[in-house]
Regions:
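Alpha-helix capping and helix-loop boundary segments enriched in small/acidic/polar residues
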Residues: 21, 29-37, 49, 120-124, ...
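Generic beta-sheet signal
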Residues: 22-26, 52, 212-213, 251-253
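Active-site-adjacent "gating/activation" loops or surface patches in catalytic cores
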Residues: 1-43
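P-loop NTPase motor domains
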Residues: 1-9, 15, 59-73, 77, ...
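A short, structure-level motif marking secondary-structure boundaries and short turns
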Residues: 26-27, 46-47, 256-258
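Walker A/P-loop NTP-binding active-site region of P-loop NTPases
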Residues: 32-84
Length: 278
């Protein structure tokens, strides 16, 4: 990389000292070149075979993504994009368990038995899914409601296996009483009957096959709850693909304009930054 006056210097975000991790925050006033710096980092990382995923608001990375032959994904009216946050959460083939055992990773796995079938889930994946649904319900920082949502996820897995959707989680909750029923009703906008259901109900149709993928969220940025949920859903999809894929492949997830998600996703972002290093 180059310093402002053209001096060459070396910086490796994958170099870890002692008990540290690989997380990086970039701060600075508006217009000083934060996105330009990240673009430079992206091109450098790609030259070292690092896969790049960038969540952006404002099309700062559209040109560089297309120039590098990446996948530019725009969320908005008519985009036809679907990201079921529960897609890939449940594994019934044992692939997830085998991948983690082969890797020697410390990622915790839970086995759920439903009749004669066994399903495997990453507890980190369940935690992320719970946080996403918590954001949808506006139930953040309420341990009781979060526990009810987590229990509903497990009950839905027992009933539906790997065929999970937000609508099915909502039905499980609505079959309960009191707070559970209220949570299920609050999920309506994100179900197949709601205005945001188009983003979450169908199977995920994004492949993540390119070396660099940019998710442009400017068109949904005014709806803070939807923006927060979409950012979390994209992050969990990336996490599950990395978890079940080639564990030797390095990747970098960039959340530009992350401050916009802090009011609704601070817990999710904090927990992901702590666990993704595993």
């Amino acid at each position: 990389m180059q310093a402002p006056q053209g001096q060459l210097f070396n910086w490796n975000p994958f170099y870890k000292i002692a008990g540290g991790n690989y997380n990086v925050q970039i701060y600075g006033p508006s217009g000083v070149g934060k996105s330009v710096l990240i673009q430079e980092m992206a091109t450098t990382m790609l030259s070292h075979n690092v896969r790049m995923f960038i969540l952006d608001i404002g099309k700062s990375y559209e040109n560089i993504c297309k120039l590098l032959g990446g996948e530019f994904i725009r969320f908005g009216s008519g985009s036809g994009i679907s990201l079921n946050p529960l897609s890939g959460l449940v594994d019934e083939s044992g692939k997830l368990k085998e991948a983690i055992l082969e890797d020697g990773s410390s990622v915790p796995i839970k086995t759920i038995r439903a009749g004669e079938k066994e399903y495997y889930v990453s507890l980190d994946g369940v935690m992320y899914a719970k946080n996403i649904i918590t954001s949808m319900c506006g139930a953040g920082n309420n341990p009781h409601k979060e526990a009810l949502i987590e229990d509903a996820i497990y009950r839905a897995i027992e009933q539906c296996g790997s065929d999970l959707t937000i609508s099915k989680i909502a039905e499980v909750l609505k079959n309960g009483n009191g707070i559970e029923k209220e949570l299920g009703e609050t999920l309506l906008p994100f179900t197949d009957r709601g205005m945001h259901g188009k983003y979450f109900e169908n199977a995920a149709n994004i492949t993540f096959k390119e070396r660099i993928t940019v998710f442009e969220l400017e068109e949904v940025a005014k709806d803070e709850t939807l923006l927060s949920v979409l950012m979390q859903v994209v992050a969990i999809q990336i996490f599950m693909q990395v978890l079940c894929g080639d564990r030797s492949q390095k990747f970098m997830l960039v959340v530009d304009e992350a401050w916009r998600a802090l009011d609704h996703s601070e817990k999710f972002l904090a927990e992901m930054s702590r666990t993704i290093r595993k």
